[in-house]
Structure formats: structure tokens, C-alpha cells
């Protein structure tokens, strides 16, 4: 195995990635090498990750519940705060039960473990998150990939699987992280019911944003708690029986130490803001509409997103890199996505509560300076 040759190959394809050292964030600004940039990369959509905490409340919490129980939840790491949080969160979202994980990635790995060694086939959207793909793969499950958001294609696959002994499982992101498109939850529920399937929805980029009404007919909802929640961790909503099965078969839960207690404190505080701070969602929705108005003028042929995730699809790595560099030079930090994350090079722009219309104006003013040519698809 030639490691240097592999790295050289990645570099030659223009796909080489590096970790960017970040100093700090403050509202809509991010600090890199002592320079400030408007931050259009954060998943902290509601700005809850930067709320001010009461130091004494935090210290009282740690004094009561310790810093870290230093064990897995199935041994001695199952803090009573887990139960309190799981009950409060599942009641707010009207689910029978909930289970907190160390990350949304871990939650998806655990979910698919419950189907291992069973006669099932998974029907997965073409653009589902990598954690879903890995969960299916690591559990050794049969799968069918349907075209992105093409529910006629999904139904044609479901209709061809007629063996009553095979359990069908449909899985989809609610909001897709790379392009901001939204799943049709009502259509997925209809197909689940028609074909007697289990339905799993990953709500990592929608939980807390009120983009969907959660249906009682969704069997399992998974989510990160590090996006709109501004905390750290993951969660699964399900029936009590499914939760118990995950506890007994979910390897990423069984073999991981529990979250430090202070993380549970931040989840607790975030829940309060998710429930009470409706003004955060209202401002974010207004910013999204303002962004889309300018986006339509500059990119009339590119699809709109009514979520906080916006993207610009480029026709080459070179044009994407040039646009990314130009924005960075003008003090604007966006996400640059490339293969294998996306099939075409893409600049992703994430809006947050902290942005204002001046930030969006500045972004588009810089993009208008760029010689479009054949730069965009």
C-alpha cells in the first residue's frame, strides 16, 4: 500500500482536503488566522450554540451530576439526566420514546443494527447522508437505491418486491445536507402504508426548524443535536419496543462511553430555546426568502431551497475553487463540497439566525463580480 501515491492521486484530481484551523466564532463571524470572515458554513441555524449560559447554573449542574460518569450507558454511564431529557424531548415532538446518542452518525449506525440477520431490504434515497449509507453497509443489509426525491421510482421498486416474508424499510433524509432539498414526508408515509414498510427519517437538518409536522406514522426519526439545536449528540425517536431493541443491538450505543454530563446540560438548555425562541425561526425564514430573491436573479437556472441550506452547483472543480477563493479573499467563508460528498462541485451556503440582509447583500455583490462564463451549471 503506497500512502504517498494515494495522496498524490487525490491531489491530482483536485479532491485533496485539509483541516482548517479555526480560532473562534462570534455571531455571524468566524476567525481564521486572526482575520474575521462572514461565516456561511455553520449548521447552528438558530444561533442556539452561542447563547449565553449562566455560570452558576452550570456549576450547580456539574456539582449535582458530575463532569463525566466515564462508562457506557449500559454499564454505569446512564445519568438520570438522560432519562429526564429523553422524556422532555419525546413529549415535545409527540413520540412514544426517545434515545440519546453521542452523535447523529452513531444514531444511524445503531438503527440499522436492529435489522441485521433479518430478512429485510432497505430502500434508500440516492443522496442520503453518509451515516445512513454506512449503517446499511456495516449491518450487511440488502438495499435498493432510488433516484433522489423520485417517489415514482421508489414505488416501482417497492412494487417489484412482493415476497411477504421480506420486510421493506424506507429511509430518507428530511432535508438533504448538500443541496437543501426537502423530502415529501406525506408521500413517504403513503408509500410506507401502501407497501407495509417501516419508515425511517433522518431529521438532522430539520429538527427544531418546524419545517415538517412529525407524523405518528413515521416509525423511526433520527437526528443530530449539533445543527439547529446548537449542542452535541444525536437522538432517535421511536416506539418503546424499537428503543429497547436498539439498546440491545445498537453497537454504537453499547460500545461507546456516554456523553460527559456537561454535554447533557447544553442539550437541556438548547431544548428550552428550541421550544421557546420562536423568533429565531421567524428571522431565519425571512432571511431565506431574502436570499432566494437575489439568488433567482443571479442564478435563474439553479433550483431554489426554502431551507437554510443553499447551494451553487459549478461545472468544474477549477471554477468552484476560483469562486471559493474569491469569496474567501473578500472575507466570506462558504463550504466547498466535492466528490464523493457530491457528484458535481458545489458551493454550499448555510444561513443562520445571526446573519442579516447586509451579509447576504455582500455575498451576492462579490459573486456578481465573478466572471460567470461556463462556471455554473
Q: What are these model-derived regions, one by one?
A:
Residues 214-245:
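Active-site PLP attachment segment
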Amino acid at each position: 500500500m503506497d500512502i504517498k501515491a494515494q495522496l498524490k492521486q487525490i491531489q491530482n484530481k483536485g479532491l485533496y482536503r485539509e483541516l482548517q484551523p479555526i480560532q473562534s466564532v462570534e455571531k455571524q463571524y468566524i476567525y481564521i488566522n486572526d482575520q474575521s470572515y462572514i461565516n456561511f458554513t455553520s449548521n447552528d441555524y438558530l444561533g442556539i450554540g452561542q447563547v449565553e449560559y449562566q455560570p452558576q447554573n452550570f456549576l450547580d449542574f456539574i456539582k449535582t451530576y458530575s463532569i463525566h460518569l466515564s462508562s457506557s450507558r449500559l454499564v454505569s454511564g446512564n445519568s438520570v439526566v438522560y432519562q429526564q431529557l429523553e422524556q422532555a424531548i419525546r413529549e415535545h415532538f409527540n413520540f412514544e420514546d426517545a434515545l440519546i446518542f453521542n452523535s447523529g452518525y452513531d444514531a444511524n449506525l445503531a438503527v440499522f443494527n436492529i435489522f441485521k440477520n433479518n430478512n429485510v431490504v432497505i430502500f434508500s434515497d440516492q443522496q442520503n447522508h453518509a451515516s445512513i449509507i454506512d449503517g446499511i453497509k456495516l449491518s450487511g443489509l440488502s438495499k435498493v437505491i432510488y433516484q433522489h426525491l423520485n417517489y415514482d421510482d421508489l414505488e416501482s421498486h417497492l412494487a417489484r418486491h412482493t415476497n411477504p416474508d421480506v420486510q421493506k424499510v424506507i429511509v430518507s433524509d428530511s432535508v438533504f445536507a448538500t443541496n437543501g432539498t426537502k423530502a415529501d414526508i406525506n408521500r413517504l408515509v403513503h408509500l410506507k402504508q401502501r407497501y407495509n414498510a417501516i419508515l425511517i427519517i433522518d431529521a438532522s437538518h430539520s429538527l427544531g426548524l418546524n419545517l415538517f409536522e412529525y407524523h405518528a406514522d413515521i416509525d423511526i426519526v433520527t437526528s443530530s443535536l449539533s445543527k439547529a439545536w446548537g449542542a452535541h449528540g444525536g437522538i432517535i425517536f421511536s416506539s418503546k419496543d424499537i428503543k429497547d431493541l436498539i439498546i440491545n443491538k445498537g453497537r454504537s450505543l453499547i460500545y461507546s462511553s456516554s456523553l460527559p454530563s456537561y454535554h447533557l446540560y447544553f442539550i437541556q438548555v438548547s431544548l428550552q430555546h428550541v421550544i421557546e425562541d420562536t423568533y429565531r425561526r421567524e428571522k431565519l425564514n425571512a432571511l431565506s426568502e431574502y436570499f432566494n430573491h437575489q439568488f433567482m436573479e443571479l442564478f435563474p437556472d439553479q433550483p431554489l431551497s426554502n431551507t437554510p441550506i443553499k447551494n451553487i452547483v459549478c461545472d468544474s472543480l477549477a471554477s468552484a475553487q476560483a469562486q471559493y477563493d474569491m469569496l474567501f479573499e473578500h472575507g466570506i467563508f462558504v463550504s466547498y463540497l466535492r466528490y464523493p460528498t457530491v457528484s458535481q462541485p458545489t458551493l454550499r451556503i448555510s444561513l443562520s439566525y445571526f446573519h442579516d440582509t447586509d451579509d447576504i447583500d455582500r455575498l451576492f455583490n462579490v459573486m456578481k463580480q465573478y466572471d460567470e462564463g461556463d462556471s455554473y451549471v
